[in-house]
Amino acid sequence: MRPEDLARMSVAELRERFLDRNRALSPECEAALTTDPRAGAREVLRLILKRRHANRAEGQRLRHLLRYEGELWDGGVTLVAGVDEAGMAPLAGPVVAGACILPRDYRPRGIDDSKQLDRRERERLAEDIKANAVCWAVARAEVEEIDRLNIYRAGLLALTRAVQALTPAPGHVLVDARKLPELRLPQTPIIHGDALSLTIAAASILAKTTRDELMGELDALYPGYGFCNHKGYPTAEHFQALERLGACPIHRRSFQPVREALGLAPLQGELFAPPPESAAEPGGEGAIAGIAPGSAPCDVAEPLPARTPASARGI
């Protein structure tokens, strides 16, 4: 398109071509819009430049989120996994971990730590991640395991199970904040990893959306507690329900507010003490995987309800 053609287009036509259809604007046409006497035409240019700036900023942000992955890729590690968990603080329900391996060219717009996203964005991104990941998995540690091991070690168990459910297996694992002692794979713990690594952020979204969906299902089994609203977290609504109804089977008996509701004495336990020899079974229950076509699924007991498997993409 020539600059003189712009003068013959209405403002509505300019909007439709350059904003709605996102057609490229040449430097000559950009200069012509700068001096266009119509305020509406200049506004179209302002919006074009604003979107261009936002796209560049998003591209830079995503490149920044891939610096850990990039170092590993450049070092010859092809399959880099990220893993994160959701549900450490709630008074009820399991802790759920998500893990995934992403293609090198995958740049999901808007991805961030799951806590920074609203429900609709998390769900949109979760479906996109599952559709584009090399492989993905979610796993959980049940309430009984949380009460037996404590929440910290149960979180490690869920994280380990999620990574071990990935097929193909990763060559390196990026973990949010912690190291997984039962995982015999190279790994890098990253403080605030869900805000600093794209792959961990993707895993956090898988964990959060899976757990939220599960708590909605548990709300139907245990009505009156409001699990579909607070997801088991310690809110005023949850405390009122505990006082009114008492604890239900998915409440964590090792957590003090639940023990108070049951009239039990406080527990005195060392949070970071090594788990019993028989307690850690990382490859055990509670894992499902999204698997690249052609790979054998992981054999795990008591899986979560089946989810849509991931599609393979080149790395």
Curated annotation (Swiss-Prot):
Gene Ontology MF terms: manganese ion binding; RNA binding; RNA-DNA hybrid ribonuclease activity
GO biological process: DNA replication, removal of RNA primer; mismatch repair
UniProt: a divalent metal cation binding residues: D84, E85, D176
A GO cellular component entry from the record: cytoplasm
Chain's gene name: rnhB
Role this protein plays: Endonuclease that specifically degrades the RNA of RNA-DNA hybrids.
Cofactor note: Manganese or magnesium. Binds 1 divalent metal ion per monomer in the absence of substrate. May bind a second metal ion after substrate binding.
UniProt feature, compositional bias: Low complexity: 278-292
Cystine pairings recorded for this chain: none
Protein name (record): Ribonuclease HII
